[in-house]
UniProtKB/Swiss-Prot annotation:
SUPFAM superfamilies: DNA-binding domain
UniProt PTM: Stabilized in root meristems by reactive oxygen species (ROS) mediated oxidative post-translational modification triggered by RGF1 hormone peptide in a RITF1-dependent manner.
Protein name as it appears in the record: AP2-like ethylene-responsive transcription factor PLT2
Biological processes per GO annotation: auxin-activated signaling pathway; ethylene-activated signaling pathway; meristem maintenance; pattern specification process; root development; root meristem growth; stem cell population maintenance; telomere maintenance
Induction: By auxin accumulation.
Lineage: Eukaryota, Viridiplantae, Streptophyta, Embryophyta, Tracheophyta
Tissues of expression: Expressed in roots, seedlings, flowers, and siliques. Also detected at low levels in leaves. In roots, specifically detected in the distal root meristem, including the QC. This tissue specificity is regulated by auxin gradient and depends on PIN proteins.
Protein's UniProt keywords contain Cell membrane: no
Protein's UniProt keywords contain Protein biosynthesis: no
The organism of origin for this protein: Arabidopsis thaliana (Mouse-ear cress)
Region of interest: Disordered: 151-173, 548-568
SMART domains xref list: AP2
Any GO MF annotation of the entry: DNA binding
Superkingdom, taxonomy of origin: Eukaryota
UniProt KW keywords: Activator, Auxin signaling pathway, Developmental protein, DNA-binding, Ethylene signaling pathway, Nucleus, Repeat, Transcription, Transcription regulation
Length: 568
């Protein structure tokens, strides 16, 4: 064999120097054609790709004629054409014999994915060639994903039918999309309207209000900030409330609408801006600071509270100052909001807290909290005035109560004018009870005494001098009474003691004491019956003061002003 003929094609374009037996033993044919010709796939060997084990290459088919630049084939060499497979016969043969069909790469991959179990089964026929399928391991998953996404409906149905029939080789697992580690553009919360801040890790709630259009923006609507929250569920709840306020109960919420029945009733009396402001106040802090008030941030160095208001001087924020407390900074923001935005401004506190007229008429900012200070002064004056009114009302009530209470309390000085005959009476039909009954013996109704308040004051003034004389004359008896009071302190309260079987009455002029005695011969138990009388010198006859009869309670008058004690 000539050593120069190892190329399998003649070097001379006109004369062939190859012997005839080389042409018959050649199993492959390298045909170089145009770009639009059928190009073999570079991932497989030529012999493995184009061999039809069943002799499917049509004998009468013509191979497309192309320009033969190197002069490999001649028109008379028909014995070499049996190794070529016509283009039309490739599509008519079984798809399992070929891995890549000409230039249509994607449908072949689909067929490969659907017939994967058949590709690895060996044909045990000895005289037939084995169909060999090669694939890249690193690109198998990607090819399966492409096949799943790009397959036509007809091919998808064919894949489903082949996967159901060929169950012996194993089921085909559907390729799932691979998630990358980068979370950019993906949702950071399972709840609607909730996002997780990538730096702070806190959850923020936003609502897209598409009812307005901002200047300079092509997209309709604006983003409404609903506050920052430590828990994801709280942020989702804030979104639900804002969505119910904006779009009504027909909107989609994270939680059932039945959880917000109370809030739905409250939001009916508020506008959208007011309700959003109330939601933000209830949040655990805004994104720019840990303040619950609008427009208030905390300084990162000295910890004081700063107030700012945005979009009043162009697109920049207006600095309002630094304050010692969070509430003062919130008030400064409210004043600036009222100044720039009028009565429709969203404030931290109620707008009636401020002097709106003074704020709107002012030409300087910051107002320095002057409106708030003036309001605080007015509130202080109002509270002091109300306090004085309450004190005066309480003093008048105390005086009236003391005057009305003197009718039953013997320690009052007004009782010097009235002889109080007291008696302990016990109804005979209730003698088995041990509670004595204390009554006032009065000819008229006791309500008349309450009506005669002015009369008592007049009588007190008229008999002031006589009372002083009486006290001087009875000074020697007061020592005796004081000594007895020290040994019996219970009598200072004017009560009747059943345990001691004694009763007493205390007045400014003296005290009367009586011992227990029996009433009637049929009484089973003893009970005290005491009458005490201390008569003032009468001013004409035996008639007492205030409708009281002084003659009923004593066996005889006591002009000396000394008490008379006796037992009946």
């Amino acid at each position: 064999m000539n050593s120069n003929n190892w190329l399998a094609f003649p070097l001379s374009p006109t004369h062939s120097s190859l012997p005839p037996h080389i042409h018959s033993s050649q199993n492959s044919h390298f045909n170089l054609g145009l770009v639009n010709d059928n190009i073999d796939n570079p991932f497989q060997n030529q012999g493995w790709n184009m061999i039809n084990p069943h002799g499917g290459g049509g004998e009468g088919g013509e191979v497309p004629k192309v320009a033969d630049f190197l002069g490999v084939s001649k028109s008379g060499d028909h014995h070499t054409d049996h190794n070529l497979v016509p283009y039309n016969d490739i599509h008519q043969t079984n798809a399992s014999d070929y891995y890549f069909q000409t230039n249509s790469l994607l449908p072949t991959v689909v067929t490969c994915a659907s017939n994967a179990p058949n590709n690895y089964e060996l044909q045990e026929s000895a005289h037939n060639l084995q169909s060999l399928t090669l694939s890249m391991g690193s690109t198998g998953a990607a090819a399966a994903e492409v096949a799943t996404v790009k397959a036509s409906p007809a091919e998808t149905s064919a894949d489903n039918s082949s996967s159901t029939t060929n169950t012996s080789g194993g089921a085909i697992v559907e390729a799932t999309p691979r998630r990358t580690l980068e979370t950019f553009g993906q949702r950071t919360s399972i709840y609607r309207g909730v996002t997780r801040h990538r730096w702070t890790g806190r959850y923020e709630a936003h609502l897209w209000d598409n009812s307005c259009r901002r200047e300079g923006q092509s997209r309709k609507g604006r983003q409404v900030y609903l506050g920052g929250y430590d828990k994801e569920e709280k942020a989702a709840r804030a979104y639900d409330l804002a969505a119910l306020k904006y779009w009504g109960p027909s909107t989609t919420t994270n939680f059932p609408i039945t959880n917000y029945e109370k809030e739905v009733e409250e939001m009916k009396n508020m506008t959208r801006q007011e309700f959003v402001a109330s939601i933000r106040r209830k949040s655990s802090g805004f994104s720019r600071g840990a303040s619950m008030y609008r427009g208030v941030t905390r300084h990162h160095q000295h910890g004081r509270w700063q107030a700012r208001i945005g979009r009043v001087a162009g697109n920049k924020d207006l600095y309002l100052g630094t304050f010692s407390t969070e509430e003062e900074a919130a008030e400064a923001y409210d004043i600036a909001a009222i100044k720039f935005r009028g009565l429709n401004a969203v404030t931290n506190f109620e707008i009636n807290r401020y002097d709106v007229k003074a704020i709107l008429e002012s030409n300087t900012l910051p107002i320095g909290g002057g409106a708030a200070k003036r309001l605080k002064e007015a509130q202080a004056l109002e509270s002091s005035r109300k306090r004085e009114e309450m004190i005066a009302l309480g003093s008048n009530f105390h005086q009236y109560g003391a005057a009305s209470g003197s009718s039953s309390v013997a320690s009052s000085s007004r009782l010097q004018l009235q002889p109080y005959p007291l008696s302990i009476q016990q109804p005979f039909e209730h003698l088995h009870h041990h509670q004595p009954l204390l009554t006032l013996q009065n000819n008229n109704d006791i309500s008349q005494y309450h009506d005669s308040f002015s009369y008592i004051q007049t009588q007190l003034h008229l008999h002031q001098q006589q009372t002083n004389n009486y006290l001087q004359s009875s000074s020697h008896t007061s020592q005796l009474y004081n000594a007895y009071l020290q040994s019996n302190p219970g009598l200072l309260h004017g009560f009747v003691s059943d345990n001691n079987n004694t009763s007493g009455f205390l007045g400014n002029n003296g005290i009367g004491i009586g011992s227990s005695s029996t009433v009637g011969s049929s009484a089973e138990e003893e009970f005290p019956a005491v009458k005490v009388d201390y008569d003032m010198p009468p001013s004409g006859g035996a008639t007492g003061y205030g409708g009281w009869n002084s003659g009923e309670s004593a066996q005889g008058s006591n002009p000396g002003g000394v008490f008379t004690m006796w037992n009946e």
